[in-house]
Amino acid sequence: TINLNRCIQYAVKNGMHYLTYLEEIVDLVHKVQTAYNENLKDLQAKGMLPLFDAGYINLARQYLTIGVNGLVEAAEFLGIPINDNDDYVDFVQGVLGLIERYNKKYRSKELMFNCEMIPAENVGVKHAKWDREDGYVVPRDCYNSYFYVVEDESLNVIDKFRLHGRRYIAHLTG
């Protein structure tokens, strides 16, 4: 899972454009996932994956997931209002579109990738805790897995639906 808030804050603090730095991270994550897939092949060849051998899981049809967390918090750090506006759409599409481009770049007959917003119950708490300990700006104790700030009472149900509409989720594939 890519901690977008940490990555984007790191880039800004080090004088880089956040998409340039994020591209390095996304490329690295794809290389790690590719190596993980090779490890699974080796384990299966040694008979160590009985569910795969029994046909319950087909390695050739298994997606390698690029998870993301901290998207809203990263946008907040950049001063982008978290509501249905063009700046926020551009930010979300830029970040998630980058991941989708790399998913397509690394796709092969043997490899398929998808991108998912990772549920925040576990990793969102850990990311926020670790980032706070390391001096990053952390606006809440749990990075959420929505496209809006959960505690924002100014958003109504229609706003929340808009923030999960096509313009925002177009590059999520998981």
Feature map (PLM): residue ranges:
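Structured mid-domain segments that build the active-site/substrate or prosthetic-cofactor binding neighborhood
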Residues: 1-69, 73-76
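Short intrinsically disordered, low-complexity coil segments enriched in acidic
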Residues: 1-6, 68, 115, 168-174
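Flexible loop/turn segments at secondary-structure boundaries
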Residues: 8-12, 80-81, 121-126
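Flexible helix-coil linker/hinge segments at domain or subdomain boundaries
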Residues: 32-41, 100-110
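A glycine-rich phosphate-binding loop feature that marks nucleotide/adenosyl-phosphate handling sites
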Residues: 42-56, 96, 109-129
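Modules that initiate DNA replication and primer synthesis
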Residues: 55-62, 73-76, 80-82, 100-101, ...
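Short secondary-structure subsegments characteristic of cysteine-rich extracellular domains
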Residues: 84-103
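Catalytic alpha/beta core of large soluble enzyme barrels
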Residues: 122-125, 132-174
